[in-house]
UniProtKB/Swiss-Prot annotation:
It is a single-pass type II membrane protein. It comes from Shewanella frigidimarina (strain NCIMB 400). NCBIfam families: PRK13165.1, PRK13254.1-3. The chain crosses the membrane at residues 9-29. Keywords: Cell inner membrane, Cell membrane, Cytochrome c-type biogenesis, Heme, Iron, Membrane, Metal-binding, Signal-anchor, Transmembrane, Transmembrane helix. Heme chaperone required for the biogenesis of c-type cytochromes. Transiently binds heme delivered by CcmC and transfers the heme to apo-cytochromes in a process facilitated by CcmF and CcmH. This is Cytochrome c-type biogenesis protein CcmE. Residues 142-161 are annotated as: Disordered. GO terms for cellular component: plasma membrane. One of its GO terms (biological process) is cytochrome complex assembly. Its main location: membrane. Residues 30-161 are periplasmic. Belongs to the CcmE/CycJ family.
Length: 161
């Protein structure tokens, strides 16, 4: 092989190796920032279609209703513990060490994002409460078996206001 071909081959191999390294680093970064959505039932029994269960230490989002009577507050700190359930009968216990949203209350729908510390227990870094009685995020509504419909507005009624 002459020196010119050898130089081209070395350059091509280096270029392919560089592209592969960048692609693998990109995939690793995207995978570590991925937050999968689960219902409480899916955390303990696995996804309905695939059977995949979240691993301990994995960052996930959990959506469901706050169980009435399950909220425990620490009087000396912001630490709160509560249970979240769904219509399939699953329950997950959530701990949170920050201010809860103003709309947060027992019996309301929430989405908690955090790390699964053990099976059935989530250490939340963020808790989101739904906006009003009628709104529910589409993924929570689908997971809980309810229909999520967009409100229809009458143009004449809007003009009369």
């Amino acid at each position: 092989m002459n020196p010119r071909r050898k130089k081209r081959l070395t350059l091509a191999v280096a270029l392919i190796a560089g592209v592969a390294a960048v692609a693998s680093l990109l995939l690793y970064a995207l995978n570590s920032n991925l937050n999968l959505f689960y219902t409480p039932y899916e955390i303990t029994h696995g996804k309905n279609d695939t059977g995949v269960m979240p691993e301990v230490g994995q960052r996930i989002r959990v959506g469901g209703m706050v169980t009435i009577g399950s909220m425990k507050r620490d009087p000396d700190s912001l630490h709160v513990e509560f249970a979240v359930h769904d219509s399939a009968g699953g329950t997950v216990f959530v701990t949170y060490d920050d201010l809860l949203p103003d709309l947060f209350r027992e019996g309301q729908g929430i989405v908690a994002q955090g790390v699964l510390v053990e099976s059935g227990k989530l250490e939340a870094t963020e808790v989101l409460a739904k906006h009003d009685e009628n709104y529910m995020p589409p993924e929570v509504a689908e997971a809980m078996g309810q229909t999520h419909e967009k409100p229809t507005y009458n143009q004449k009624a809007l003009e009369d206001k």
